[in-house]
Amino acid sequence: MQYQNDLILRAARGEAVERTPVWLMRQAGRILPEYRAVREKLSGFIELCTTPALAAEVTIQPVDILGVDAAIIFSDILVIPEAMGLPYEMQESKGPFFPKVITSAADIDALLATDAADHLTYVYDAIELAVKELNGRVPLIGFAGAPFTILAYMIEGQGSKTFSKARRFLYTEPVLAHRLLEKITLATIAYLKRQVQAGAAMYQIFDSWAGVLPPDQYREFSLRYIKQICEAVPQVPRTVFSKGAFFVREDFNNFPCETVGLDWNMDIGESKKIIGPHKTLQGNMDPCALYLSEEQIRVKAKEMLDAFGTQSHIANLGHGLYPDTDKTKVKCFVDAVKEFGVKK
């Protein structure tokens, strides 16, 4: 497809760009009154995810309202365990909750793997609708959760500060852990292939809980499976965002992805040296910096851009937008990137 604005694709591929592209994790969400107006008419988050026309509508909202350089499909990383046979609920103000969790080999054997992707047609339909409506204005980003992050929820049953149950499972049941991770990986590969077929022009793998593991475990139980996914779905630019995994930045030097996401705790200059010049970096302003005044946000955005340089960088935050962030502050950040990110 030909895009009117393909900055993000060129930046991901390491090609020259006239300015730094920008998008935001959780850009389609509660920060937008327009999103809340759609959401309040429904039973909840999951109904919005599973209604293609509405998911497509809120996917496009940030492009129109904030002026970002890409849309990202409105969905959730936990649609994968749901499709595999482990349903979840999204509890208001508490987050995801799994009434049943994985505790045994029999539980794992009962899960679908590759065939799970067949149960996610609502996501592909939403992508197709959004791509059609965008009509080449900007690319659409697909995404999935990293297998370890998905396992963490399937074992723990909900969010956690420590994910001690999931981590204990890796120590005490490593064979079962790998069996579960292999199934999640197969499901994710099939899922991302279908997203690309539906029109996703690039994709991101979110390893939200990477930072809870020590380096050796992270390489064994997470990074190897992310690599398997990236190698299996190479048709479009690939971004890997391993939050908190500062200890494996060197591993990304020769990793099968085009872009590496940095969280706000990762020093930009140090990361550029460790990861190397042949990878595009994404990030990494602290989401809390958007609580500053607009003048201060502009200063912070310029500092970030100066540190990254105008090439091989996709501007973003170091994690998702917080729900109570002022929309005008978010727009200020996007506009600042567009102003200060111009190649000189």
Curated annotation (Swiss-Prot):
Residues carrying the site annotation Transition state stabilizer: D76
Subcellular location: Cytoplasm
Any GO MF annotation of the entry: uroporphyrinogen decarboxylase activity
Coiled-coil segments on the chain, per record: none
Gene Ontology process terms (BP): protoporphyrinogen IX biosynthetic process
GO CC, any one term: cytosol
Enzyme Commission designation: 4.1.1.37
Catalytic activity: uroporphyrinogen III + 4 H(+) = coproporphyrinogen III + 4 CO2
Top EC class, one word: lyase
Involved pathway(s): Porphyrin-containing compound metabolism; protoporphyrin-IX biosynthesis; coproporphyrinogen-III from 5-aminolevulinate: step 4/4
Superkingdom classification of source: Bacteria
UniProt cross-references to PROSITE patterns, sorted A to Z: UROD_1 (PS00906), UROD_2 (PS00907)
Main location per the UniProt record: cytoplasm
Binding-site positions, substrate: R26, Q27, A28, G29, R30, D76, Y153, S208, H319
CDD domains, sorted: URO-D
Free-text function comment from the UniProt entry: Catalyzes the decarboxylation of four acetate groups of uroporphyrinogen-III to yield coproporphyrinogen-III.
Subunit structure comment from the entry: Homodimer.
Family recorded in the similarity comment: Belongs to the uroporphyrinogen decarboxylase family.
Protein name: Uroporphyrinogen decarboxylase
Source organism (scientific name): Cytophaga hutchinsonii (strain ATCC 33406 / DSM 1761 / CIP 103989 / NBRC 15051 / NCIMB 9469 / D465)
Native organism taxonomy: Bacteria, Pseudomonadati, Bacteroidota, Cytophagia, Cytophagales
